[in-house]
């Protein structure tokens, strides 16, 4: 840079001298920028690369790629953003000049995607490079040397905590932060340990006082424990003695019962073998029935699917047939149009050929005429004519030139008029053809719209049908769900009533007999008495069963004759005998009405009154069976009435609620257990009704299952609707395409043609007017030319014998013009016919016919394929139906076989049940004996376990208590609880029981009175007496706190721990004191380093803000929230602009925020100055007034304190710099920057006049 000011005398350690950039971002190749002056401004248009120069400075000073607006180092190479890097590396070198003139080169580059650092050309580590930077007071983390674009306002808007962090980094007090926090944690922990040890010592003193109290209780406690042990030993000996005696007796009975069971087992096995054989055959027959049923169900499903498929094929055939008819209509229309086009094309070609012949004949006629020539001149006259013509042209040269131009204009206007007329005619024909296309498309649109309407109507009908079918399906499903719900309830009721188990053979036969009687005598046989009535409440079931006991299953009929016929029927069919109650033969006594008025005893009712007849025919039979029998609440009441102790003093037949019957004769009968079983007959009646309802529900559900084909029909209709909707969508898309694309395009083209044609008449009128004007001009010039020619050719015309030379020339010209017009007319007509031929040829009707023929052929093939599939499906449906009928016949045969085998199986099973009953009875007795044995063995184990658990010393003859294992459950020392556990049957292995058999107890010490007890009650009473004595002793023991028998040992341990806790407390106090001293030292160092930096900044910031504002009324304040430890809390920064009241920082204007941020930056920089300061567009938010203030301050600072480099776009700012660096872009695919340097110091000295006389030339950085 020429004339650049020197910085050799610049105060401080040194300055940024020059910057060398090679292939960095937009700087292609190598550039040397500088030398930099005290105040250097970098200018240039947006996008030229100014910020890239800022990035280059930041890069060489150690910034990371993320701060340089790239993701990785390789993106810094020129061309990398467009994937065309110019090299594999880039480099930036900062030549730093010390105050003694020495220059050090700081170089940082990118090589193969990694960063490298060099000092004076020597490669160094990143740490060494940063250390060298810090030696010249450049700290990259604190960024005390640069401000990025847009960051100036963020500096002012930092939060107090962020401002504190900034001061921590600048003051380097954060270097003490880790040690500070570590010591603070250790100090807190040491103080907590000290407090813990102090509390521990207090607890040990309390424990020492308690140890003495324990010793005094030990002896008293031990005396009572000894007495309790003696009583417990006596109790367990007593219980074990009687337990072992019962075990020996049970073993003898078990051996005898096993012999009986062996004999019964052989009989049972033989009968079960017979049952198994018949049952196997029955199950096989059932499986065949189920298999055939499933097969029929599947075939029924397949039949529904085939019927649905048949329906779908029929619909498809009809659809294809309709498509075929439409396609044939379209083919006929295309053939008709193609035929018309062929006829029209032949006529046009014929007309064109005739015109061409006429034109050729006319051209021959013209040639012949020209050869004849009506006016012939001699050669001499022709030469003379030529000479005179040349003379006339020379004398009228100016006029001839004007005449020639006028003729050209006239011919041009005439040609334009003819051209516009031809265009008008062509447009009229094209508009006519386009109107035909529009009409054709409109016809197609109308046809397609009609098809859409028909399809929509069909779809609407199908949707209505679908809705109806779906409603039917929903109703069926709802009904099925209700039936299933009812079925579940019925099955649950059957399960609860135990009525769903298999009926006995006898009951089943009797049920079949009654059903047969009802079928043969439907009007005469009413049913069993138990089925024809029902107790009014369940609590009367047992009492009414007792009264009706003999006749509960009797059959009620109308007459004795019917009863006789029914008995014959039963004998013929070998059914069990039945009891009949014919209404006409029953002798019924009237009811005693006084019995309904009995008050005492309370609750007495006639049995007849508590039974509700459910059939009118049952009333007489019910009255016959019940008579005047009474039902009472209790046995005492029934007994009182039966023995004449009631209000009426008469004897009556009475039954209590529990079924005890008292006769007038004094006979009493009970049998409550048997009555309870018989009373279930009432439940059996309900069960029977439930079974019937279950069967009805199963039949209904099965019928609904057969309606599943309706669901398939739903799917079929839905598929047809989907097909229609898809076709509708396609047709609507085609209709939309025709309307919006084809018709709209044709209409637009027609409108364009019409508009263009409407523009032609004015243009034709304009051409006619221009032609008239050019013709008038031509005639005027022609008159002037004729005057000259008449004068020159006057003698020649007289000699030749013509009135004027123009008569000769006009005749020749007229003939020539007429011939040319005639020929042009022929050409126009031929061209018009050629255009029409081309237009008709473009219609290509035959191609449309071929397309329609192919479409008809394709649809016809599809139609035939569908018909073939329909025929095949019909044959398959017929075959499937015939196969189903055959399978149904087979199913009926298999059902009959299954029923026969079931009857045989029931007969065999009845015989086996008797043997099974005897075997089961013997087995139950054996189980009872074994259970008693096991119970007593477990009881013995439980007693031994309790002895071992309670550490009770039993006298043993042999064995050891070690054979008794501990159980993993809670126990008690008392015999009563041990007995309870034995009763519950604890989980003990057989091996454990056998092992305990080796334990033989010595009962010599057991008194005789305890051994002589024979029954369980006596044993229980003796045990209870001992338990009472033991409980009393235990209560006395439990009232005492169990003493610690090792009290002396505990006292010694307490004293030893007391000494240890005293020592630990002293050590903790010393440690806490030492750590606190260390913490206070680190705290002081951190505080001093922070305050040494913060105080000068806080003291100078107000002056700097006043200087920037150029007003002494401006105020800036910087203060810490925490005065004792300012680095722990925030730092407040507030500014009061000149002439304004105090406002928070975020309420200041953009310019005021910028001035405040600059004041803070310059104050911080003044405390920890870097050798130079780089600012990127800090004036963005400043107006011209503030720019002037900031620029003046920077100029003063640059002369006195620091080197400043500023990127700016505002002339008011950069015109005060000492030098300018201009950045400009080169035109290229990738942004490429160029650099200019310009020295302004000489102009500050020589002034503007010299600059005007000798304008300087900027130097280009290389």
UniProtKB/Swiss-Prot annotation:
InterPro entries attached to this UniProt entry: P-loop_NTPase, RecF/RecN/SMC_N, SMC, Smc1_ABC, SMC_hinge, SMC_hinge_sf
CDD domains xref list: ABC_SMC1_euk
Phenotype upon loss of function: Defective chromosome segregation during germline mitosis, resulting in aneuploidy. RNAi-mediated knock-down is embryonic lethal and results in aberrant chromosome segregation in mitosis.
Subcellular location: Nucleus; Chromosome
Spans annotated as Disordered: 965-994
Biased composition (Polar residues): 974-991
Positions of short motif DA-box: 1148-1183
Gene3D superfamilies recorded: 1.20.1060.20, 3.30.70.1620, P-loop containing nucleotide triphosphate hydrolases
Keywords: Cell cycle, Cell division, Chromosome, Coiled coil, DNA damage, DNA repair, Mitosis, Nucleus
Highest taxon of the lineage: Eukaryota
MF GO annotations: ATP binding; ATP hydrolysis activity; DNA binding
GO biological process, one term: response to X-ray
Entries under SMART domains matching the protein: SMC_hinge (SM00968)
GO CC, any one term: MIS12/MIND type complex
Keyword DNA repair in record: yes
Major location (coarse): nucleus
Domain (SMC hinge) ranges: 524-642
Coiled coil: 171-497, 680-937, 1017-1086
Function in brief: Involved in chromosome cohesion during cell cycle and in DNA repair. Required for chromosome segregation during mitosis. Central component of cohesin complex. The cohesin complex is required for the cohesion of sister chromatids after DNA replication. The cohesin complex apparently forms a large proteinaceous ring within which sister chromatids can be trapped. At anaphase, the complex is cleaved and dissociates from chromatin, allowing sister chromatids to segregate.
Family affiliation: Belongs to the SMC family. SMC1 subfamily.
Self-association and partners: Component of the cohesin complex, composed of the smc-1 and smc-3 heterodimer attached via their SMC hinge domain, scc-1 which links them, and scc-3. Interacts with smc-3, scc-1, scc-3 and tim-1.
Name of the protein described by the UniProt record: Structural maintenance of chromosomes protein 1
Organism: Caenorhabditis elegans
């Amino acid at each position: 840079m020429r004339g650049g000011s020197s910085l050799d005398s610049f105060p401080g350690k040194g300055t940024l001298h020059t910057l060398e950039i090679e292939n960095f971002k937009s700087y292609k190749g190598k550039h040397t920028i500088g030398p930099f002056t005290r105040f250097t401004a970098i200018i240039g248009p947006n996008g030229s690369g100014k910020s890239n120069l800022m990035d280059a400075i930041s890069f060489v000073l150690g910034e990371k790629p993320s701060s340089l607006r790239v993701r990785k180092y390789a993106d810094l190479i020129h061309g990398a953003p467009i994937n065309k890097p110019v090299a594999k590396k880039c480099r930036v070198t900062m030549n730093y000049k010390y105050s003694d003139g020495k220059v050090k080169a700081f170089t940082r580059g990118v090589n193969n995607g990694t960063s490298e650092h060099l000092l004076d050309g020597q490669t160094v580590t990143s740490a060494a490079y940063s250390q060298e930077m810090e030696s010249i007071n450049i700290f990259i983390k604190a960024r005390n040397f640069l401000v990025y674009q847009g960051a100036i306002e963020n500096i002012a808007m930092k939060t107090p905590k962020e401002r504190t962090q900034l001061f921590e980094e600048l003051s380097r007090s954060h270097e003490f932060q880790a040690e500070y926090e570590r010591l603070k944690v250790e100090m807190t922990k040491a103080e907590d340990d000290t407090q813990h040890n102090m509390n521990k010592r207090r607890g040990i003193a309390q424990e020492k006082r308690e140890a003495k109290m324990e010793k005094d209780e030990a002896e008293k406690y031990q005396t009572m424990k000894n007495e309790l042990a003696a009583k417990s030993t006596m109790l367990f000996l007593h219980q074990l003695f009687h337990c072992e005696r019962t075990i020996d007796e049970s073993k003898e009975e078990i051996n005898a019962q096993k012999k009986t069971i062996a004999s019964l087992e052989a009989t049972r096995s033989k009968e079960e073998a017979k049952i198994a054989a018949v049952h196997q055959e029955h199950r096989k027959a059932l499986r065949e029935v189920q298999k055939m049923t499933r097969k029929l169900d599947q075939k029924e499903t397949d039949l529904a699917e085939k019927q649905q498929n048949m329906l779908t094929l029929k619909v498809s055939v009809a659809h294809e047939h309709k498509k075929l008819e439409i396609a044939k209509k379209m083919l006929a229309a295309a053939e008709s149009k193609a035929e018309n086009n062929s006829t029209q094309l032949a006529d046009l070609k014929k007309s064109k050929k005739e015109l061409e012949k006429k034109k050729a004949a006319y051209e021959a006629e013209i040639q012949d005429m020209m050869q004849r020539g009506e006016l012939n001149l001699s050669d001499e006259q022709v030469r003379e004519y030529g000479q005179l013509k040349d003379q006339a042209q020379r004398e009228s040269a100016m006029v001839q030139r004007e005449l020639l131009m006028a003729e050209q204009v006239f011919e041009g206007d005439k040609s334009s008029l003819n051209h516009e007329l031809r265009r008008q005619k062509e447009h009229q024909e094209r508009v006519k053809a386009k109107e035909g296309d529009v009409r054709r498309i409109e016809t197609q649109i109308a046809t397609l719209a009609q098809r859409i309407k028909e399809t929509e109507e069909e779809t609407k009908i199908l949707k209505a049908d679908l809705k109806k079918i779906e409603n039917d399906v929903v109703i069926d499903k709802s009904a099925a769900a209700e039936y299933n719900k009812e079925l579940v309830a019925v099955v649950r009721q059957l399960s609860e009533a135990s009525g769903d188990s298999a009926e006995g053979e006898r009951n089943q036969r009797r049920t079949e007999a009654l059903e047969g009687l009802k079928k043969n005598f439907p009007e005469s046989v009413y049913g069993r008495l138990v089925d024809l009535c029902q107790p009014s409440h369940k609590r009367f079931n047992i009492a009414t069963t007792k009264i009706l006991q003999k006749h509960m299953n009797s059959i009620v009929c109308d007459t004795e004759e019917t009863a006789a016929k029914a008995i014959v029927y039963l004998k013929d069919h070998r059914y069990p005998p039945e009891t009949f109650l014919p209404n006409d033969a029953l002798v019924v006594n009237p009811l005693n009405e006084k019995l309904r008025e009995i008050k005492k005893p309370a609750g007495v009712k006639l049995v007849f009154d508590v039974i509700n007849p459910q059939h009118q025919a049952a009333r007489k039979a019910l009255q016959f069976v019940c008579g005047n029998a009474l039902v009472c609440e209790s046995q005492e009441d029934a007994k009182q009435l039966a023995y004449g102790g009631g209000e009426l003093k008469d004897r009556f037949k009475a039954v209590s609620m529990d079924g005890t019957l008292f006769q007038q004769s004094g006979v009493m009968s009970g049998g409550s257990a048997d009555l309870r079983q018989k009373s279930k007959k009432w439940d059996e009646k309900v069960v029977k009704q439930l079974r019937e309802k279950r069967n009805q529900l199963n039949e209904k559900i099965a019928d609904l299952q057969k309606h599943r084909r309706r669901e398939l029909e739903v799917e079929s209709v839905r598929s047809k609707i989907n097909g229609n909707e898809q076709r509708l969508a396609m047709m609507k898309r085609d209709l939309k395409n025709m309307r919006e694309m084809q018709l709209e395009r044709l209409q637009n083209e027609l409108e364009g043609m019409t508009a263009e044609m409407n523009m032609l008449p004015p243009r034709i009128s304009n051409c006619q007017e221009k032609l008239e004007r050019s013709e008038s001009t031509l005639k005027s010039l022609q008159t002037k030319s004729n005057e000259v020619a008449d004068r020159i050719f006057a003698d020649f015309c007289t000699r030749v014998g013509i009135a004027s030379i123009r008569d000769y020339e006009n005749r020749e010209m007229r003939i020539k013009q007429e011939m040319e017009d005639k020929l042009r007319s022929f050409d126009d007509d031929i061209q018009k016919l050629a255009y029409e031929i081309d237009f008709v040829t473009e219609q290509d009707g035959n191609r449309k016919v071929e397309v329609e023929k192919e479409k008809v052929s394709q649809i016809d093939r599809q139609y035939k394929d569908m018909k073939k599939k329909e025929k095949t499906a019909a044959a398959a449906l017929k075959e499937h139906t015939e196969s189903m009928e055959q399978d149904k016949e087979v199913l009926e045969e298999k059902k009959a076989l299954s029923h026969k085998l079931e009857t045989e199986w029931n007969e065999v099973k009845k015989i086996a049940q008797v043997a099974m009953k005897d075997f089961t009875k013997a087995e139950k007795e054996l189980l009872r004996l074994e259970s008693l044995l096991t119970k007593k063995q477990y009881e013995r184990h439980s007693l031994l376990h309790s002895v071992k658990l309670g550490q009770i010393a039993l006298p043993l003859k042999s064995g050891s208590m070690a054979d008794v294992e501990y159980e993993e459950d809670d126990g008690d020392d008392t015999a009563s609880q041990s007995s309870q556990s034995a009763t519950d049957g604890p989980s003990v292995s057989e091996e454990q029981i056998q092992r305990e058999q080796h334990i033989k107890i010595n009962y010599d010490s057991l008194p005789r009175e305890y051994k002589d007890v024979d029954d369980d009650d006596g044993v229980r009473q003796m045990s209870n007496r001992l338990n009472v004595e033991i409980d009393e002793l235990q209560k006395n023991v439990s009232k005492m706190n169990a003493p610690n028998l090792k009290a002396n040992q505990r006292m010694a341990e307490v004293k030893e721990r007391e000494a240890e806790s005293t020592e630990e407390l002293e050590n903790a106090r010393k440690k806490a004191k030492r750590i606190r001293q260390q913490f206070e030292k680190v705290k002081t160092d951190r505080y001093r380093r922070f305050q040494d930096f913060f105080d000068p900044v806080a003291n100078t910031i107000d002056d700097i803000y006043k200087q920037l504002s150029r007003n002494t009324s401006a105020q800036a304040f910087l203060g810490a929230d925490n005065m004792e430890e300012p680095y722990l809390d925030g730092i407040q920064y507030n500014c009061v602009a000149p002439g304004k009241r105090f406002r928070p920082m975020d309420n200041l204007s953009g310019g005021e925020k910028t001035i405040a941020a600059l004041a803070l930056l310059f104050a911080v920089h003044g405390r920890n100055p870097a050798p130079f300061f780089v600012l990127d567009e800090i004036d963005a938010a400043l107006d011209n007034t503030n720019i002037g203030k900031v620029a003046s301050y920077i100029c003063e600072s640059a002369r006195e304190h620091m080197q400043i480099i500023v990127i700016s776009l505002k002339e008011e700012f950069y015109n005060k710099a000492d030098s300018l660096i201009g950045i400009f872009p080169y035109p290229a695919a990738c942004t490429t920057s160029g650099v200019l340097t310009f020295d302004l110091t000489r102009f500050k000295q020589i002034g503007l006049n010299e600059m005007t006389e000798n304008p300087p030339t900027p130097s280009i950085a290389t």
